[in-house]
Amino acid sequence: IDHAWMSAPTFPPHPHAGFSAVTYLFLDSETGMANRDSLGTRNLIEPGGLHWTAAGRGVVHEEVPAATGSTTHLLQIFVNLPEARQNAAPFALSLASQDVPVLQLPGARVRVPLGSYGELHSPLAPPTDVTLLDITLEADAELAIPVPAGHRAFVMPVNGSAEIDGAGFGLDDLGA
């Protein structure tokens, strides 16, 4: 996982193969990311939106801030493809910000760009089972996140700190 702020082109067009590259823009981004790839995909990933590139047997892509000088705040996540799909034809999935399911709770907002939380389910069906929750908590708010048997969880505070099962940590604890 790469947690980044970008305000200018950073990476020239580059190849990927055998895994998925997932880009999620946080709502506080000042601009979107212009995405293009060798499949002919050309789209704007808006703040709050997500783009999933399943590279399969190979794809070249580039993502740059749509407005140079304006900052994007994002996660770039590399997700392994199932072995049977690692040499499959590449494809891309996109989810606009307004299509991300949102649950507003007392003291918490949960956005579900991938996977599910409670009764909310992302409309995307990626080739790898992944849940991505963008959670905003008010001070001293609590939220239970059940982790199904056979799954693992990774929590990354991007602003402030959190306490999980009694252990406190913040972004600095991740070496970011």
What are these regions (language model features)?
Residues 81-109:
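Long amphipathic alpha-helical segments that form oligomerization/scaffold cores
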Residues 17-40, 46-50, 139-141, 146-171:
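Glycine- and acidic-residue-biased ligand/ion/polar-headgroup-sensing regions
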Residues 9-12, 38-41, 62-67:
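Catalytic micro-motifs at enzyme active sites that drive phosphoryl/nucleotidyl and oxygen chemistry
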Residues 1-26, 98-144:
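A short glycine-rich, His/Asp/Glu-containing loop-to-beta-strand
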Residues 43, 49, 61, 73-75, ...:
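Generic beta-strand structural signal
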Residues 56-85, 168, 176:
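Ligand-binding loop in jelly-roll beta-barrel domains
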Residues 87-93, 114, 121-126, 143-148, ...:
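A short secondary-structure junction signal
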